Amino acid sequence: MSAPILQPLQLQGQTLQIEAQWLRAERVARPLTIFLHEGLGSLSQWRDFPLRLCEALDCRGLIYSRPGYGNSSPRRDPWPQDYLQRQAKAQLPACLDALGVARDERLFLFGHSDGASLALLFAAAFPERVRGVVAMAPHLFVEPCTIEGLRQARQAYEHGRSLRAALARHHADTDSAFYGWNDAWLRPGFERWNIEDDLRARLACPVLALQGEEDEYGSLAQIEAIARLHADTVLCALPGCGHAPQREQPEMVIEHTQALFQRCQA
Protein backbone atom coordinates (compact mmCIF):
# COMPACT_ATOMS: atom_id res chain seq x y z
CA MET A 1 0.00 0.00 0.00
CA SER A 2 1.51 3.31 -1.08
CA ALA A 3 1.40 6.47 1.03
CA PRO A 4 -1.23 9.13 0.24
CA ILE A 5 -0.18 11.69 -2.35
CA LEU A 6 -1.32 15.17 -3.38
CA GLN A 7 -1.93 15.24 -7.13
CA PRO A 8 -2.38 18.52 -9.07
CA LEU A 9 -5.65 18.73 -10.99
CA GLN A 10 -6.80 21.26 -13.59
CA LEU A 11 -10.57 21.62 -13.44
CA GLN A 12 -12.64 24.38 -15.03
CA GLY A 13 -9.76 26.84 -15.06
CA GLN A 14 -8.74 26.13 -11.46
CA THR A 15 -5.63 24.38 -10.18
CA LEU A 16 -6.58 22.02 -7.35
CA GLN A 17 -4.81 19.43 -5.22
CA ILE A 18 -6.33 15.97 -4.90
CA GLU A 19 -5.45 13.67 -2.00
CA ALA A 20 -5.22 10.09 -3.26
CA GLN A 21 -3.85 6.68 -2.34
CA TRP A 22 -3.21 3.55 -4.40
CA LEU A 23 -3.76 0.09 -2.93
CA ARG A 24 -1.96 -3.00 -4.23
CA ALA A 25 -0.71 -0.98 -7.22
CA GLU A 26 1.79 -3.72 -8.05
CA ARG A 27 -1.10 -6.00 -9.09
CA VAL A 28 -1.12 -4.38 -12.51
CA ALA A 29 -3.01 -7.22 -14.21
CA ARG A 30 -5.91 -7.13 -11.76
CA PRO A 31 -9.05 -4.97 -12.03
CA LEU A 32 -9.15 -1.52 -10.43
CA THR A 33 -11.73 -0.53 -7.80
CA ILE A 34 -12.42 3.19 -7.24
CA PHE A 35 -13.66 4.11 -3.75
CA LEU A 36 -16.05 7.10 -3.58
CA HIS A 37 -16.65 8.48 -0.10
CA GLU A 38 -19.76 9.82 1.64
CA GLY A 39 -20.88 13.45 1.92
CA LEU A 40 -18.75 14.07 5.03
CA GLY A 41 -16.10 11.52 4.11
CA SER A 42 -12.50 11.53 2.97
CA LEU A 43 -9.67 9.18 2.13
CA SER A 44 -8.71 8.55 5.76
CA GLN A 45 -12.29 7.96 6.92
CA TRP A 46 -12.42 4.70 4.98
CA ARG A 47 -9.89 3.36 7.53
CA ASP A 48 -8.72 -0.14 6.58
CA PHE A 49 -11.88 -1.21 4.75
CA PRO A 50 -10.65 -0.55 1.17
CA LEU A 51 -7.49 -2.60 1.70
CA ARG A 52 -9.48 -5.44 3.26
CA LEU A 53 -11.87 -5.43 0.33
CA CYS A 54 -9.11 -5.26 -2.28
CA GLU A 55 -7.33 -8.19 -0.64
CA ALA A 56 -10.57 -10.20 -0.61
CA LEU A 57 -11.21 -9.39 -4.28
CA ASP A 58 -7.55 -9.64 -5.32
CA CYS A 59 -7.79 -6.30 -7.07
CA ARG A 60 -6.09 -2.91 -7.08
CA GLY A 61 -7.72 0.06 -5.37
CA LEU A 62 -7.73 3.84 -5.64
CA ILE A 63 -9.08 6.08 -2.88
CA TYR A 64 -9.26 9.85 -3.15
CA SER A 65 -10.78 12.82 -1.33
CA ARG A 66 -12.98 14.92 -3.55
CA PRO A 67 -12.28 18.69 -3.65
CA GLY A 68 -13.65 20.18 -0.44
CA TYR A 69 -12.74 17.14 1.65
CA GLY A 70 -9.79 15.62 3.46
CA ASN A 71 -6.49 17.14 2.40
CA SER A 72 -7.73 18.00 -1.07
CA SER A 73 -8.25 21.67 -1.96
CA PRO A 74 -11.05 23.27 0.10
CA ARG A 75 -14.37 24.14 -1.48
CA ARG A 76 -14.38 27.64 -3.02
CA ASP A 77 -18.09 28.04 -3.77
CA PRO A 78 -21.38 26.56 -2.51
CA TRP A 79 -22.31 23.23 -4.04
CA PRO A 80 -25.10 23.73 -6.62
CA GLN A 81 -28.20 21.55 -6.50
CA ASP A 82 -26.84 19.33 -9.26
CA TYR A 83 -23.38 19.02 -7.72
CA LEU A 84 -23.35 15.22 -7.86
CA GLN A 85 -24.31 15.19 -11.53
CA ARG A 86 -21.53 17.69 -12.25
CA GLN A 87 -19.01 15.69 -10.27
CA ALA A 88 -19.93 12.51 -12.16
CA LYS A 89 -19.65 14.08 -15.61
CA ALA A 90 -16.66 16.41 -15.11
CA GLN A 91 -14.84 16.18 -11.78
CA LEU A 92 -14.51 12.40 -11.45
CA PRO A 93 -13.28 11.91 -15.05
CA ALA A 94 -10.75 14.72 -14.53
CA CYS A 95 -9.54 13.15 -11.28
CA LEU A 96 -9.10 9.77 -12.95
CA ASP A 97 -7.13 11.39 -15.79
CA ALA A 98 -4.91 13.29 -13.34
CA LEU A 99 -4.22 10.12 -11.36
CA GLY A 100 -3.20 8.22 -14.48
CA VAL A 101 -6.18 5.90 -14.87
CA ALA A 102 -6.44 4.85 -18.50
CA ARG A 103 -9.71 5.83 -20.15
CA ASP A 104 -10.08 2.38 -21.70
CA GLU A 105 -9.74 0.57 -18.35
CA ARG A 106 -13.08 -0.76 -17.17
CA LEU A 107 -13.53 0.10 -13.51
CA PHE A 108 -15.28 -1.37 -10.51
CA LEU A 109 -16.89 1.42 -8.45
CA PHE A 110 -17.56 1.21 -4.72
CA GLY A 111 -19.50 4.21 -3.42
CA HIS A 112 -20.96 5.15 -0.05
CA SER A 113 -23.87 7.61 0.40
CA ASP A 114 -23.07 10.63 -1.83
CA GLY A 115 -20.31 8.48 -3.29
CA ALA A 116 -22.84 5.75 -4.13
CA SER A 117 -24.98 8.27 -6.01
CA LEU A 118 -21.83 9.49 -7.75
CA ALA A 119 -20.90 5.94 -8.75
CA LEU A 120 -24.33 5.34 -10.27
CA LEU A 121 -24.27 8.66 -12.12
CA PHE A 122 -20.79 7.99 -13.52
CA ALA A 123 -21.82 4.48 -14.61
CA ALA A 124 -24.86 5.95 -16.38
CA ALA A 125 -22.84 8.69 -18.09
CA PHE A 126 -19.89 6.47 -19.08
CA PRO A 127 -21.23 2.89 -19.29
CA GLU A 128 -18.25 1.76 -21.38
CA ARG A 129 -15.89 2.55 -18.49
CA VAL A 130 -17.64 0.59 -15.71
CA ARG A 131 -17.77 -3.16 -15.15
CA GLY A 132 -19.76 -3.09 -11.88
CA VAL A 133 -21.07 -0.82 -9.11
CA VAL A 134 -21.56 -1.28 -5.39
CA ALA A 135 -23.97 1.45 -4.23
CA MET A 136 -23.99 1.46 -0.43
CA ALA A 137 -26.60 3.71 1.25
CA PRO A 138 -27.22 5.63 -1.99
CA HIS A 139 -29.39 8.71 -2.46
CA LEU A 140 -31.66 8.81 -5.51
CA PHE A 141 -34.14 11.28 -4.06
CA VAL A 142 -34.76 13.19 -0.85
CA GLU A 143 -36.86 11.68 1.95
CA PRO A 144 -38.17 13.35 5.13
CA CYS A 145 -35.76 11.24 7.19
CA THR A 146 -32.89 12.57 5.07
CA ILE A 147 -33.75 16.18 5.91
CA GLU A 148 -34.22 15.35 9.58
CA GLY A 149 -30.86 13.59 9.70
CA LEU A 150 -29.19 16.61 8.12
CA ARG A 151 -30.79 18.98 10.62
CA GLN A 152 -29.66 16.82 13.51
CA ALA A 153 -26.14 16.71 12.09
CA ARG A 154 -26.09 20.52 11.86
CA GLN A 155 -27.26 20.82 15.45
CA ALA A 156 -24.55 18.42 16.58
CA TYR A 157 -21.86 20.21 14.58
CA GLU A 158 -22.75 23.71 15.73
CA HIS A 159 -23.71 23.05 19.35
CA GLY A 160 -21.81 19.90 20.29
CA ARG A 161 -18.15 19.00 20.28
CA SER A 162 -17.82 15.39 19.24
CA LEU A 163 -18.84 15.66 15.56
CA ARG A 164 -16.68 18.72 14.88
CA ALA A 165 -13.73 17.11 16.66
CA ALA A 166 -14.20 13.84 14.78
CA LEU A 167 -14.30 15.58 11.40
CA ALA A 168 -11.30 17.77 12.26
CA ARG A 169 -9.15 14.63 12.40
CA HIS A 170 -9.85 13.95 8.73
CA HIS A 171 -10.36 17.32 7.00
CA ALA A 172 -7.90 20.19 6.57
CA ASP A 173 -10.85 22.61 6.40
CA THR A 174 -13.64 21.14 8.52
CA ASP A 175 -16.16 23.92 7.83
CA SER A 176 -15.63 23.57 4.09
CA ALA A 177 -16.41 19.86 4.29
CA PHE A 178 -19.40 20.15 6.60
CA TYR A 179 -21.18 23.19 5.21
CA GLY A 180 -20.60 22.30 1.57
CA TRP A 181 -22.63 19.14 2.13
CA ASN A 182 -25.10 20.33 4.77
CA ASP A 183 -25.92 23.69 3.19
CA ALA A 184 -26.59 22.08 -0.19
CA TRP A 185 -29.04 19.51 1.14
CA LEU A 186 -30.88 21.95 3.43
CA ARG A 187 -31.15 24.70 0.82
CA PRO A 188 -34.80 25.50 -0.08
CA GLY A 189 -35.81 23.55 -3.17
CA PHE A 190 -33.33 20.71 -2.67
CA GLU A 191 -36.15 18.47 -1.46
CA ARG A 192 -37.08 18.12 -5.15
CA TRP A 193 -33.64 16.76 -6.06
CA ASN A 194 -33.92 13.42 -7.86
CA ILE A 195 -31.52 11.47 -10.09
CA GLU A 196 -33.84 8.71 -11.27
CA ASP A 197 -34.13 10.20 -14.76
CA ASP A 198 -30.33 10.46 -14.95
CA LEU A 199 -30.11 6.70 -14.41
CA ARG A 200 -33.15 5.44 -16.30
CA ALA A 201 -32.19 3.13 -19.21
CA ARG A 202 -28.54 4.25 -18.96
CA LEU A 203 -26.99 1.72 -16.55
CA ALA A 204 -25.36 -1.20 -18.34
CA CYS A 205 -23.41 -3.08 -15.63
CA PRO A 206 -24.36 -5.24 -12.65
CA VAL A 207 -25.23 -3.24 -9.53
CA LEU A 208 -25.19 -4.29 -5.88
CA ALA A 209 -27.40 -1.94 -3.86
CA LEU A 210 -26.84 -2.14 -0.08
CA GLN A 211 -28.87 -0.36 2.59
CA GLY A 212 -28.90 -0.61 6.36
CA GLU A 213 -32.42 -1.11 7.68
CA GLU A 214 -31.68 1.41 10.45
CA ASP A 215 -30.13 4.04 8.15
CA GLU A 216 -30.98 7.48 9.53
CA TYR A 217 -30.51 9.20 6.16
CA GLY A 218 -32.59 6.98 3.88
CA SER A 219 -35.01 4.07 3.69
CA LEU A 220 -35.05 0.89 1.64
CA ALA A 221 -37.03 2.87 -0.95
CA GLN A 222 -33.68 4.19 -2.20
CA ILE A 223 -32.28 0.83 -3.28
CA GLU A 224 -35.70 -0.41 -4.39
CA ALA A 225 -35.76 2.50 -6.83
CA ILE A 226 -32.49 1.28 -8.36
CA ALA A 227 -34.01 -2.16 -8.94
CA ARG A 228 -37.01 -0.60 -10.67
CA LEU A 229 -34.73 1.40 -12.95
CA HIS A 230 -32.19 -1.34 -13.72
CA ALA A 231 -33.01 -5.04 -13.93
CA ASP A 232 -29.43 -6.19 -13.28
CA THR A 233 -29.54 -5.06 -9.64
CA VAL A 234 -29.03 -7.19 -6.54
CA LEU A 235 -30.69 -5.74 -3.44
CA CYS A 236 -29.28 -6.28 0.03
CA ALA A 237 -31.02 -4.94 3.15
CA LEU A 238 -28.83 -5.22 6.25
CA PRO A 239 -30.78 -5.75 9.51
CA GLY A 240 -29.59 -3.77 12.50
CA CYS A 241 -27.33 -1.61 10.36
CA GLY A 242 -27.25 2.18 10.02
CA HIS A 243 -25.74 4.52 7.45
CA ALA A 244 -22.19 3.09 7.41
CA PRO A 245 -22.29 -0.66 6.62
CA GLN A 246 -18.54 -0.72 5.88
CA ARG A 247 -17.91 0.12 9.54
CA GLU A 248 -20.90 -1.59 11.15
CA GLN A 249 -21.03 -4.84 9.15
CA PRO A 250 -17.84 -5.01 7.06
CA GLU A 251 -17.82 -8.79 6.71
CA MET A 252 -21.31 -8.81 5.21
CA VAL A 253 -20.40 -6.00 2.81
CA ILE A 254 -17.26 -7.83 1.68
CA GLU A 255 -19.16 -11.10 1.22
CA HIS A 256 -21.85 -9.53 -0.96
CA THR A 257 -19.29 -7.51 -2.91
CA GLN A 258 -17.25 -10.64 -3.65
CA ALA A 259 -20.32 -12.24 -5.22
CA LEU A 260 -20.88 -9.25 -7.49
CA PHE A 261 -17.18 -9.00 -8.37
CA GLN A 262 -17.09 -12.65 -9.42
CA ARG A 263 -20.06 -12.05 -11.72
CA CYS A 264 -18.30 -9.08 -13.27
CA GLN A 265 -15.21 -11.22 -13.97
CA ALA A 266 -17.16 -14.05 -15.59
Regions found by a protein language model. Give the residues of each.
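Active-site nucleophile elbow and catalytic-triad environment of alpha/beta-hydrolase enzymes
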Residues: 182-199
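Conserved alpha/beta-hydrolase "nucleophile elbow" surrounding the catalytic nucleophile
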Residues: 111-113
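Conserved HGGG/HGGXW glycine-rich cap/lid loop of the alpha/beta-hydrolase fold
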Residues: 23-74
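Short beta-strand/loop motif that positions the catalytic acidic residue
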Residues: 202-203, 209-211
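Flexible "cap/lid" loop of the alpha/beta hydrolase fold
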Residues: 117-125, 130-161
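Active-site loop/oxyanion-hole signature of alpha/beta-hydrolase fold enzymes
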Residues: 63-107, 255
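Acidic catalytic loop of the alpha/beta-hydrolase fold
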Residues: 213-218, 243
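Catalytic active-site module of serine/aspartate enzymes centered on a nucleophile-bearing elbow/loop
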Residues: 239-266
